Protein backbone atom coordinates (compact mmCIF):
# COMPACT_ATOMS: atom_id res chain seq x y z
CA UNK A 1 0.00 0.00 0.00
CA UNK A 2 0.96 3.65 -0.10
CA UNK A 3 0.99 5.56 3.15
CA UNK A 4 -1.25 8.35 1.91
CA UNK A 5 -3.82 5.96 0.43
CA UNK A 6 -7.37 6.35 1.73
CA UNK A 7 -8.59 3.00 0.49
CA UNK A 8 -7.56 -0.16 2.31
CA UNK A 9 -6.02 1.72 5.22
CA UNK A 10 -8.68 4.38 5.73
CA UNK A 11 -7.33 7.77 6.77
CA UNK A 12 -3.84 6.47 7.45
CA UNK A 13 -3.97 4.41 10.66
CA UNK A 14 -0.89 2.25 11.01
CA UNK A 15 -1.17 -0.32 13.75
CA UNK A 16 2.49 -0.59 14.74
CA UNK A 17 2.86 3.18 14.97
CA UNK A 18 -0.61 4.14 16.24
CA UNK A 19 -1.93 1.38 18.49
CA UNK A 20 -1.96 2.35 22.17
CA UNK A 21 -0.17 -0.54 23.85
CA UNK A 22 3.24 -1.44 25.28
CA UNK A 23 4.82 -2.92 28.40
CA UNK A 24 6.56 -1.67 31.54
CA UNK A 25 7.71 1.96 31.08
CA UNK A 26 6.09 1.97 27.63
CA UNK A 27 2.72 0.61 28.75
CA UNK A 28 -0.29 2.47 27.35
CA UNK A 29 1.77 4.47 24.88
CA UNK A 30 0.99 5.14 21.25
CA UNK A 31 3.16 2.89 19.13
CA UNK A 32 3.99 0.71 22.09
CA UNK A 33 5.23 -2.22 20.02
CA UNK A 34 7.69 0.07 18.24
CA UNK A 35 8.91 1.23 21.63
CA UNK A 36 9.29 -2.38 22.76
CA UNK A 37 11.28 -3.25 19.63
CA UNK A 38 13.65 -0.32 20.16
CA UNK A 39 14.08 -1.11 23.85
CA UNK A 40 14.42 -4.88 23.58
CA UNK A 41 16.34 -5.13 20.32
CA UNK A 42 18.19 -1.90 19.59
CA UNK A 43 19.03 -0.88 23.17
CA UNK A 44 19.25 -4.16 25.09
CA UNK A 45 20.51 -6.29 22.23
CA UNK A 46 18.03 -9.13 22.76
CA UNK A 47 17.68 -11.64 19.93
CA UNK A 48 14.77 -11.04 17.57
CA UNK A 49 12.64 -14.02 18.58
CA UNK A 50 13.11 -13.45 22.32
CA UNK A 51 12.06 -9.79 22.50
CA UNK A 52 9.27 -9.34 25.04
CA UNK A 53 6.09 -7.57 24.01
CA UNK A 54 2.45 -6.93 24.85
CA UNK A 55 1.23 -10.40 23.90
CA UNK A 56 2.39 -13.02 26.42
CA UNK A 57 4.09 -10.36 28.58
CA UNK A 58 4.80 -11.72 32.03
CA UNK A 59 4.27 -15.32 30.96
CA UNK A 60 6.16 -17.75 33.18
CA UNK A 61 8.55 -19.88 31.08
CA UNK A 62 7.91 -23.61 31.00
CA UNK A 63 10.59 -26.24 31.55
CA UNK A 64 10.65 -28.51 28.52
CA UNK A 65 12.83 -31.57 27.93
CA UNK A 66 13.82 -31.93 24.29
CA UNK A 67 16.74 -33.12 22.18
CA UNK A 68 19.30 -30.34 21.91
CA UNK A 69 20.69 -29.37 18.49
CA UNK A 70 23.78 -27.66 17.14
CA UNK A 71 23.88 -25.11 14.32
CA UNK A 72 23.84 -27.91 11.72
CA UNK A 73 20.81 -29.66 13.16
CA UNK A 74 22.80 -32.49 14.71
CA UNK A 75 21.25 -33.96 17.86
CA UNK A 76 23.33 -33.31 20.99
CA UNK A 77 21.32 -35.24 23.55
CA UNK A 78 18.44 -34.54 25.89
CA UNK A 79 18.28 -31.20 27.70
CA UNK A 80 15.73 -29.35 29.79
CA UNK A 81 15.30 -25.79 28.60
CA UNK A 82 13.02 -22.88 29.41
CA UNK A 83 10.57 -21.83 26.73
CA UNK A 84 7.58 -19.52 26.29
CA UNK A 85 5.77 -17.54 23.62
CA UNK A 86 6.73 -13.98 22.72
CA UNK A 87 4.83 -11.21 20.94
CA UNK A 88 4.65 -12.11 17.26
CA UNK A 89 3.85 -8.55 16.18
CA UNK A 90 7.03 -7.11 17.68
CA UNK A 91 8.86 -9.44 15.29
CA UNK A 92 7.13 -7.73 12.35
CA UNK A 93 8.63 -4.28 13.04
CA UNK A 94 12.00 -4.65 11.25
CA UNK A 95 10.34 -6.07 8.14
CA UNK A 96 7.84 -3.20 8.08
CA UNK A 97 10.80 -0.84 8.36
CA UNK A 98 12.50 -2.51 5.40
CA UNK A 99 9.28 -2.19 3.40
CA UNK A 100 9.07 1.51 4.19
CA UNK A 101 12.67 2.14 3.21
CA UNK A 102 12.89 0.01 0.07
CA UNK A 103 9.42 0.69 -1.34
CA UNK A 104 7.94 3.82 0.22
CA UNK A 105 11.27 5.68 0.20
CA UNK A 106 12.11 4.08 -3.17
CA UNK A 107 15.64 3.20 -2.09
CA UNK A 108 15.44 -0.34 -3.52
CA UNK A 109 12.08 -0.93 -5.23
CA UNK A 110 11.35 -4.58 -5.85
CA UNK A 111 13.65 -5.85 -3.11
CA UNK A 112 10.99 -8.13 -1.65
CA UNK A 113 10.11 -9.44 -5.11
CA UNK A 114 13.77 -10.19 -5.78
CA UNK A 115 13.96 -12.08 -2.50
CA UNK A 116 10.90 -14.20 -3.29
CA UNK A 117 12.11 -14.84 -6.85
CA UNK A 118 15.47 -16.06 -5.56
CA UNK A 119 13.72 -18.70 -3.48
CA UNK A 120 11.53 -19.78 -6.37
CA UNK A 121 14.47 -20.28 -8.69
CA UNK A 122 17.27 -21.45 -6.39
CA UNK A 123 16.75 -22.88 -2.94
CA UNK A 124 18.00 -26.20 -1.58
CA UNK A 125 16.12 -27.15 1.57
CA UNK A 126 18.67 -29.83 2.42
CA UNK A 127 21.44 -27.21 2.52
CA UNK A 128 19.49 -24.80 4.69
CA UNK A 129 18.14 -27.48 6.99
CA UNK A 130 17.83 -25.46 10.22
CA UNK A 131 15.93 -22.35 11.29
CA UNK A 132 19.22 -20.57 12.00
CA UNK A 133 20.65 -21.26 8.55
CA UNK A 134 17.41 -20.13 6.93
CA UNK A 135 17.39 -16.90 8.95
CA UNK A 136 20.96 -16.08 7.88
CA UNK A 137 20.19 -17.00 4.27
CA UNK A 138 17.10 -14.79 4.25
CA UNK A 139 19.20 -11.77 5.28
CA UNK A 140 21.84 -12.61 2.67
CA UNK A 141 19.28 -12.91 -0.11
CA UNK A 142 17.54 -9.70 0.90
CA UNK A 143 20.83 -7.79 0.76
CA UNK A 144 21.57 -9.32 -2.65
CA UNK A 145 18.09 -8.37 -3.79
CA UNK A 146 18.48 -4.71 -2.88
CA UNK A 147 22.27 -4.32 -3.27
CA UNK A 148 22.66 -2.75 0.17
CA UNK A 149 24.63 -3.80 3.25
CA UNK A 150 22.01 -4.15 5.98
CA UNK A 151 24.16 -6.03 8.51
CA UNK A 152 24.14 -3.20 11.05
CA UNK A 153 20.36 -2.89 10.75
CA UNK A 154 19.84 -6.63 11.15
CA UNK A 155 22.17 -6.75 14.14
CA UNK A 156 20.39 -3.94 15.96
CA UNK A 157 17.02 -5.54 15.16
CA UNK A 158 18.23 -8.74 16.84
CA UNK A 159 18.19 -10.85 13.68
CA UNK A 160 21.95 -11.03 13.20
CA UNK A 161 22.87 -12.10 16.72
CA UNK A 162 23.96 -15.44 18.18
CA UNK A 163 21.09 -17.43 19.63
CA UNK A 164 20.57 -20.94 20.96
CA UNK A 165 16.96 -21.14 22.07
CA UNK A 166 13.97 -23.43 21.80
CA UNK A 167 11.32 -21.21 20.23
CA UNK A 168 7.59 -21.52 20.92
CA UNK A 169 6.05 -20.03 17.81
CA UNK A 170 3.36 -21.47 15.58
CA UNK A 171 5.35 -24.69 15.89
CA UNK A 172 8.17 -25.26 18.42
CA UNK A 173 11.80 -25.89 17.51
CA UNK A 174 15.39 -24.82 17.96
CA UNK A 175 16.88 -21.67 16.49
CA UNK A 176 20.66 -21.83 16.61
CA UNK A 177 22.87 -19.10 15.16
CA UNK A 178 26.54 -18.90 16.10
CA UNK A 179 28.83 -15.89 16.14
CA UNK A 180 30.76 -17.50 13.28
CA UNK A 181 27.59 -17.55 11.17
CA UNK A 182 27.01 -13.85 11.90
CA UNK A 183 30.62 -12.99 11.07
CA UNK A 184 30.45 -14.95 7.82
CA UNK A 185 27.44 -12.94 6.65
CA UNK A 186 29.16 -9.66 7.52
CA UNK A 187 32.24 -10.74 5.59
CA UNK A 188 30.08 -11.69 2.61
CA UNK A 189 28.29 -8.32 2.55
CA UNK A 190 31.61 -6.47 2.79
CA UNK A 191 33.06 -8.54 -0.08
CA UNK A 192 30.17 -7.50 -2.33
CA UNK A 193 31.00 -3.84 -1.81
CA UNK A 194 27.39 -2.94 -1.10
CA UNK A 195 26.84 0.57 0.31
CA UNK A 196 25.74 0.58 3.93
CA UNK A 197 22.18 1.44 4.92
CA UNK A 198 21.66 4.57 7.05
CA UNK A 199 22.86 4.10 10.62
CA UNK A 200 19.48 5.25 11.97
CA UNK A 201 17.37 2.92 9.80
CA UNK A 202 16.07 1.07 12.87
CA UNK A 203 14.15 4.25 13.74
CA UNK A 204 12.23 4.64 10.47
CA UNK A 205 8.43 4.55 10.74
CA UNK A 206 5.36 5.61 8.79
CA UNK A 207 5.59 9.18 10.08
CA UNK A 208 9.25 9.99 9.52
CA UNK A 209 9.94 7.99 6.37
CA UNK A 210 9.93 11.12 4.20
CA UNK A 211 13.02 12.27 6.08
CA UNK A 212 14.71 9.00 5.09
CA UNK A 213 13.47 9.35 1.52
CA UNK A 214 14.87 12.87 1.25
CA UNK A 215 17.98 12.01 3.29
CA UNK A 216 17.39 14.92 5.64
CA UNK A 217 20.37 15.66 7.88
CA UNK A 218 19.50 16.23 11.51
CA UNK A 219 20.72 19.44 13.07
CA UNK A 220 23.34 18.93 15.75
CA UNK A 221 22.09 19.61 19.25
CA UNK A 222 23.71 20.16 22.61
CA UNK A 223 24.09 17.29 25.04
CA UNK A 224 21.66 17.72 27.92
CA UNK A 225 19.31 20.05 26.05
CA UNK A 226 16.03 19.26 24.31
CA UNK A 227 14.82 16.46 26.57
CA UNK A 228 13.58 16.24 30.14
CA UNK A 229 13.31 13.32 32.55
CA UNK A 230 9.75 12.74 33.74
CA UNK A 231 8.84 9.73 35.90
CA UNK A 232 11.68 7.58 34.55
CA UNK A 233 10.88 8.57 30.95
CA UNK A 234 12.77 10.90 28.64
CA UNK A 235 10.43 13.35 26.93
Question: Which sequence ranges carry the predicted segments?
Answer:
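Active-site recognition of the HExxH zinc-binding catalytic motif
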Residues: 1-6
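Short, glycine/acidic-rich hinge or "gate" loops at secondary-structure transitions
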Residues: 9-18
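Active-site-proximal alpha-helical
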Residues: 22-166, 175
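Beta/coil-rich, acidic/histidine-enriched accessory regions frequently appended to metallopeptidases
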Residues: 130-235
Amino acid sequence: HKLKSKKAYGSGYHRLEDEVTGIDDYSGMRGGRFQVYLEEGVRKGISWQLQDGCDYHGTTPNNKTVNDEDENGNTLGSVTTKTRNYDHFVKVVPFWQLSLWTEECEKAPGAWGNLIHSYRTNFNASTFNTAGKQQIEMMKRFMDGCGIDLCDFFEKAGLLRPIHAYIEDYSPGWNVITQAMCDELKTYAASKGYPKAPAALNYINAYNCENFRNEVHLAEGTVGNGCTLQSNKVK
